[in-house]
């Protein structure tokens, strides 16, 4: 019985379709703001670490069918 239930659950999970490709509107421009910190060094106490902070703004606009312009 457990085997049948497991097989049914796996079949249901495997048949689910997800859309991986993002969909952007052709009439709108999507704007994303990213912020990241990159640290170098050892995580032990008493040792120095160096790092850099990155800020990024990305604009995505439709260029043609299934083609996009990133700025």
Swiss-Prot record:
Name the record gives this protein: Vitellogenin-A1
Source organism per UniProt: Xenopus laevis
Keywords of this entry: Phosphoprotein, Signal, Storage protein
Domain of life: Eukaryota
Molecular function GO terms recorded: lipid transporter activity; nutrient reservoir activity
Induction: By steroids (estrogen).
Record-annotated Vitellogenin domain positions: 24-71
UniProt-listed PANTHER family: VITELLOGENIN 1-RELATED (PTHR23345:SF15), VITELLOGENIN-RELATED (PTHR23345)
GO biological process: cellular response to estrogen stimulus; response to estradiol
Job of this protein: Precursor of the major egg-yolk proteins that are sources of nutrients during early development of oviparous organisms.
Tissues expressing the protein: Produced by the liver, secreted into the blood and then sequestered by receptor mediated endocytosis into growing oocytes, where it is generally cleaved, giving rise to the respective yolk components.
Coiled-coil parts of chain: none
Annotated signal peptide: 1-15
């Amino acid at each position: 019985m457990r085997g049948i239930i497991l097989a049914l659950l796996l079949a249901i999970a495997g048949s689910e379709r997800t859309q991986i490709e993002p969909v952007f509107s052709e009439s709108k421009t999507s704007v994303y703001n990213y912020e990241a910190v990159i640290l170098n060094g050892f995580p032990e106490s008493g040792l120095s670490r160096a790092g850099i902070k990155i800020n990024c703004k990305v604009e995505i606009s439709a260029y043609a069918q299934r083609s996009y312009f990133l700025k």
